[in-house]
Amino acid sequence: MTELTQVLQLQSMSATHVIESGNQRVVLLIVAHADDVALFLGGTVAAWAASGWRVVVVRVTDDRWDSVGLSEADTIIANAAEFRRAADILGVAEIVELGYPTDTLADVSEVALREQFIRQIRLHRPYALVTFDPYAMYGEDNQDHIKVAAAADEAFWTSQFDKHHPEHLAEGLKVHGCFERWYFGRKVVDVTDVVDISDTLDRKIEAACQHTTMMTNFANQLCLQASTGGWDLPLAASVVATGDIRPMMEALVAASSAATGAAHGLGAAEEFRVVTFGGLAGYLEHLGVRRP
């Protein structure tokens, strides 16, 4: 076996990832819904922003149905406003709204959605592309997450092809290759990188607490399920009755972050599958020359 083959065949192991200085390099985060950022990776987003990374978030849907007791129009307005507040807390530099109706992406052409993502990659020219892990969908019942994951994963490599959407080039955009891909999910498979969010957990919790509309609906769902099973859920019932989501969100976010951290000997953490240089980082390290 050659040395290069040995390098390429090294099995990945999870390691604590220290966020380096961004120097205004771009992280492009593509999510389906407003609450995805805070709940899945709010601590890491806050760490990126604090370290000088420019974080751009693309929200694909308008979350028009994610509420309880509000009209569709009021739901769109409320969720957008709460998303902006949460993003400000985390240090997000820019939000891009694609405005697709929520919970309907299963009927949207994946190729059409991919084109939207390619455009954003070529426009913002990110160092890292961040989205749902298409290979960590076991137990995932949200088709919006699944469709975004698949389209974004393909957009990573098709954004580098000048034959894919030459109309972008005619508009002055250029093909672009992201150096890293960061994948997250409900349960990440083959975790490679763990980010210690002990210093940014408070901001993650505070950002999550901005999503009153969506989390009240979530609490209502929990109460409905519990009732069917013959249970009461006082914390969730209190949210439905009062609209105060903070006690529930503080408990849930702190507990989940601590559980992830405990698995890696940390106080609080978030897990990712990170792919560098298209999965050929060993090749790059063996034959490449780093620029000064």
Identify the role of each PLM range.
Residues 33, 141-145, 211:
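Histidine-centered active-site/metal-ligand motif
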Residues 47, 151, 155, 207:
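Hydrophobic/aromatic ligand-binding patch that stacks against planar heteroaromatic rings
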